[in-house]
Design a protein with these regions (language model features):
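Core AdoMet radical
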Residues: 2-21, 25-119, 125-132, 154-159
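Conserved C-terminal portion of the radical SAM core fold
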Residues: 35-37, 110-168, 178-199
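Hydrophobic alpha-helical scaffolding
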Residues: 8-11, 172, 176
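Short, well-ordered secondary-structure micro-motifs
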Residues: 46, 79, 102, 138-140, ...
Length: 200
């Protein structure tokens, strides 16, 4: 099942534009730069493009850490990105294994977990988190945090669901107090990773 959200759609940016935006990001104080594509995962075409973009940004000597976020990926594809200069790969588990079929039917939770394992095998640093407030239970939240910790990620994005009228989840099911409690819980359950709080 796919939903049509009111978002801007565009094709891949040019390598020149990507380098220009990375340069501006560094000038604004950024220490990392993310190369993101939409879709299920990496294809040969996308892998080649992200690799070319990574090489170009690294060649600009900006001192930026490069993070790729391109969906499911094989070890071979990830090794190609690493060789091109990508430092981290971001692939979130989103929620618990049990609750996952409620929010996504295009691919399985196990595929997401396997991609995270592939990231580690390829020698990239893993960025892996999830989203809170989609109707999951506290048990689901704990299960997801346990799964994330088992992957020993470098960074953990903690997303809090932002409703979109195109989606069947009509409101955030988490209170501000619960959100703060979950941040505390994540710090305890995933002690060795850097936690990042963002919208989702």
């Amino acid at each position: 099942v796919r939903y049509k959200a009111d978002i801007q759609r565009y094709t891949l940016k040019s390598i020149e534009q990507i380098v220009s935006e990375a340069t501006q990001a560094r000038a604004n104080g950024a220490v990392g730069f993310c190369l993101v594509t939409a879709g299920l995962g990496l294809t040969d075409k996308k892998t080649k493009f992200i690799a070319e973009a990574a090489k170009a940004v690294k060649a600009a000597n900006l001192g930026l850490r490069l993070i790729a976020c391109n969906g499911t990926a094989t070890v071979e594809q990830l090794k190609e990105l690493k060789a091109a200069g990508v430092d981290n790969y971001n692939h979130n588990l989103e929620t618990s294994r049990d609750f996952y079929p409620t929010i996504c039917t295009t691919h399985s939770w196990d595929e997401r977990y396997q991609t995270c394992l592939n990231v580690k095998e390829a020698g990239l640093k893993l960025v892996c988190g999830g989203i809170f407030g989609m109707g999951e239970t506290q048990e689901d939240r704990i299960s997801m945090l346990e799964a994330i910790n088992s992957l020993d990620p470098m960074n953990v994005p903690l997303n809090f669901f932002h409703p979109n009228k195109a989606l069947p989840i009509v409101k955030n099911t988490i209170t501000r107090e619960e959100a703060f409690d979950l941040i505390t819980l994540a710090r305890k359950m995933i002690p060795n990773a850097h936690k990042i709080m963002i919208a989702g």
